[in-house]
């Protein structure tokens, strides 16, 4: 029997045995048994049809992304050397290696920066060439979970960066200043953010949306995006579309294009020298 239509059978035949009344359609049943007018019966049937999903068409299931991480190399010597040449503190490098946020790929010896979810499962991986200009992502990467280092305790502030290396550069400078680099949330945006032509129509980066949902106590967002036109425009766009409940601060690097330039300048590492060292290390392979 069809739900909501009494004694109407699926083959559209019905019989009210006590009254010796029968018919061949739901329309007959509603008029003869339920006492609806012709138009009322039509509207009722049409209304039920509108809310019932089609029987013959199955809803498509949203396929989940499967992250295909590059095979890990047994050592991380090239990656460690590469990051040290860029001024990153060894304590930070060891932390990332230990927590599964960083490793060296077996095939091309790329640096693999892994984004993990709250269950500590890998969901995203940024690839960075050691001694080359290669930049990419592992297949199946979910940008909602880009590289990050959450604060070790409750915190109301998150700092945003374009890349994992910029994030680690900022954390290194925090350590150089005698501060606890695990005191605040650190989040990368997995590359350059491209706003809409009309800034007010831009979307908040998916990784930031996810992060703010998972850390609802965050009240302040500090921008450390690049000191170029793209970085300045991205900062302006995101600040424009963020809900007004958040306080925002813009703190681009004081020297150079990005925070790694800033760090290297502070440490006296010239960019040409560190790039040359990385390239030489790459040729040694």
Map each language-model feature to its residues.
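Single conserved hydrophobic/aromatic residue that forms the stacking wall/gate
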Residues: 1-9
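Short, small/acidic-rich helices and loops at N termini and domain boundaries
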Residues: 10-45, 99-101, 263-268
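Terminal peptide-recognition signature
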Residues: 16, 30, 83, 162, ...
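TOPRIM fold recognition
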Residues: 24, 172-285
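Short active-site loop/helix that positions an aromatic residue
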Residues: 32, 167, 171-176
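Intrinsically disordered, low-complexity linkers and terminal tails enriched in Pro/Gly
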Residues: 48-65
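Basic, glycine-enriched DNA-binding surface that flanks or lies within the catalytic cores of DNA
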Residues: 60-144, 148-152
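Conserved mixed alpha/beta catalytic, RNA-binding, or beta-rich assembly cores of soluble enzyme
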Residues: 160-165, 191-194
